[in-house]
Amino acid sequence: MAKTNPGNFFEDYSIGQVLHHAVPRTVTNGERALYHALYPARHALYSSDEFARNCGLPQSPIDDLAAFHVVFGKTVPDISLNAVANLGYAEGRWLQPVYPGDTLRSESQVIGLKQNSNGKTGVVWVRTRGLNQRDEVVIEYVRWVMVRKSNLDAPAPETVVPDLKPALSVDDLVVPQGLDFSKYDFVQSGQSDRWDAYKTEETIDHVDGVTVEEAEHMLATRLWQNTAKVHFDLTTRPEGRLIYGGHVISMARALSFNGLANAQMIVGLNDGAHANPCFAGDTIKAWSQVLDKAETGVPGVGALRLRLVATKGGAPFALRGDDGKYLPDVLLDLDYWALMPI
């Protein structure tokens, strides 16, 4: 019997199947330091223990996306090792902060299956949960992936497409216990604009750009213990190593500091598309659009629903062509909720 893991293929999944992913990961300030070295992340809540304590938290949490990448990375050997593409995200929620010293593990349940008409691939929907050492859920999200079949003669499963929310409402969002922006320091945060300064449909060009390097993107992907072959093996694609989509997400979020410095905590993920592939040598820029805004149930804490778009060129705020398809320079279209002082 083979002792190596070839990964799961489409025919290996079944509705209701639960996957317990190896290996647990204790996150420390080492991950924080590397995260801030790999991305120009500057949001104050994740940079300063004193700033975080002034906002009612016990210390500075691990960056929301760093925690997401750890949880996501655990799922790759079981879900996307044989994937053709990661197709989308929905119903993502950050339920409580992750602090240095927390140990994270991941588990997923298959909630949807649909074989493609070519008979060679199919789409798998999974709901993934990240849990800490106290078995508390810290992150949950749905994603769907196109996965290859190994046995092309395997019968197609019954098609089940989950009914997912098009977007989370403000009532679905969880404000971390103790979060209090009444003593928020706008000088130290780097920007004076509060929640009420942002208007629905407003667009923000984040101006700065970062060129992706081969060594950096592979270091980042290894940091999250993401084992997907396409990110490392030069022989898997004629164009070269594909940049992990999460690398683009984190880069764009970090660039958004210039214009959204007070959008401190990501608490919801409504939708996301990796519109076009990213490769080393591409220069990532970003822009945002305010889609919605709402007051949370916590006094002084507002929520902004933001579209974050990462590009590798083209005009700011350009997204789709006349045919409705993403323009070739668009890398990422992400829809998320963030908390901001009112």
Report residues per predicted region.
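HotDog/MaoC-like acyl-thioester-processing domains
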Residues: 1-15, 98-176, 280, 287-342
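Hot-dog-fold acyl-thioester-processing enzymes
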Residues: 1-87, 139, 150-269, 325-333, ...
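Short, structured motif recognition centered on aromatic/hydrophobic residues
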Residues: 35, 89, 104-108, 124-128, ...
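Short amphipathic alpha-helical patches
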Residues: 58-62, 94-99, 158, 275-279
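A cross-kingdom feature marking solvent-exposed beta-strand/loop segments within repeated
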Residues: 85-96, 110-112, 265-278, 291
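Generic recognition of flexible, low-complexity loop/linker segments
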Residues: 238, 274, 294-295
